[in-house]
Amino acid sequence: MDRHNHVVFSLSKTHDLVSRICQKLKMPMGLITHNEFADGETYIRFEESVRNKDVFIFQSTCAPVNDSLMELLIAIDALKRGSAKSITAILPYYGYARQDRKTMGREPITSKLVADLLTTAGVSRVALTDIHSDQTQGFFNIPVDTLRTYHVFLTRTVELLGKKDLVVVSPDYGGVKRARLIATSLELPLAIIDKRRPAHNVAESINVLGEVANKNCLIVDDMIDTGGTVIAAAKLLREHHAKKVCVMATHGLFNGEAPQRFQKAFNEGLVDYLFVSNSIPQTKFDQCPQFQVIDLAPLFEEVLLCYANNSSISAIYTRHIEWIKKHV
């Protein structure tokens, strides 16, 4: 990347991640002054010129979600008023993604509202990472890139479990498309958990569709919130005599008692390994060998180079999957 024409900034939730990205790119991270006034208002100032530059700004809109989102909106406004040539907002985690439709009367579609806010603030392009539902792309009236991370995870998980006797498992019907993409890319069998959700953050797994007995099962999901879905799925897989059960999720929110639930699942042998990415800073598991964080810095490095060189992002996935097939 040409540091004279491109500049990379990070807001509060992605600083460690972007530091590694810039280190790989051998370019400095842009400097930002970020303060909070006594009444809680956010102040942001960019400490270098962005005039006529292509700007890439990273932020995960994770907890506290509203503060993280407002920080991003203010930063985009500052870049726009600073005459940036283009502003690409890269969101490793996109908050409010689950509020993407109305299920009852008088409900909002907050994911669409957030898309409108980002567009109005002045962003030129948005990159979303393993979004909860593909329809989110249609909420924007600007270019949107939906980045996939499965190939980054598979390098580690397949290396650990091996392809023999490996089954990809979707913890519910909503995740079938995601799980099938992974299973198809490596020519692996697919299993599905039949689940119902009687209330918010409450999940019940009922049955397994597919052969999992004496198999190494890899449960695939986009995010883990309270952990109820994947732990219930793991328990059901064990009841169906699965040999190993590992969980792979891009976004680890781990709200409420999720860390304690997973620690109990590790201790009871329900879950062998839990893999999440650093799309959200991970601080809730200390020195736990079963909990592994997959670094997304190499992926974002490649994505930024694609932006800088006007090349195809989809080629990244093809190249990595071919490498996994040959070497893992």
Curated annotation (Swiss-Prot):
Coiled-coil region: none
Active site: 195
GO terms, biological process: 5-phosphoribose 1-diphosphate biosynthetic process; purine nucleotide biosynthetic process; ribonucleoside monophosphate biosynthetic process
Matches recorded under SMART domains: Pribosyltran_N (SM01400)
Amino-acid positions noted as binding Mg(2+) 1 in the UniProt annotation, renumbered to this chain: 132
Family annotation (InterPro entries): PRib_PP_synth_CS (IPR000842), Pribosyltran_N (IPR029099), PRibTrfase_dom (IPR000836), PRTase-like (IPR029057), Rib-P_diPkinase (IPR005946), Rib-P_diPkinase_bac (IPR037515)
Functional pathway: Metabolic intermediate biosynthesis; 5-phospho-alpha-D-ribose 1-diphosphate biosynthesis; 5-phospho-alpha-D-ribose 1-diphosphate from D-ribose 5-phosphate (route I): step 1/1
Pfam families registered for this protein in UniProt: Pribosyltran, Pribosyltran_N
Claim: Lipid metabolism is one of the keywords in the record: no
Binding site for Mg(2+) 2: 172
Positions contributing to ATP binding: 39-41, 98-99
EC number: 2.7.6.1
Annotated binding of D-ribose 5-phosphate, by residue: 197, 221, 225-229
Chief location of this protein within or outside the cell: cytoplasm
Key word Metal-binding present: yes
Record field: catalytic activity: D-ribose 5-phosphate + ATP = 5-phospho-alpha-D-ribose 1-diphosphate + AMP + H(+)
CDD domains: PRTases_typeI
Known partners and oligomeric status: Homohexamer.
Alphabetical list of NCBIfam families matching this protein: PRK00553.1 (NF001815), PRK01259.1 (NF002320), ribP_PPkin (TIGR01251)
The family this protein is said to belong to: Belongs to the ribose-phosphate pyrophosphokinase family. Class I subfamily.
Function: Involved in the biosynthesis of the central metabolite phospho-alpha-D-ribosyl-1-pyrophosphate (PRPP) via the transfer of pyrophosphoryl group from ATP to 1-hydroxyl of ribose-5-phosphate (Rib-5-P).
Protein name in UniProt: Ribose-phosphate pyrophosphokinase
Organism: Mycoplasma pneumoniae (strain ATCC 29342 / M129 / Subtype 1) (Mycoplasmoides pneumoniae)
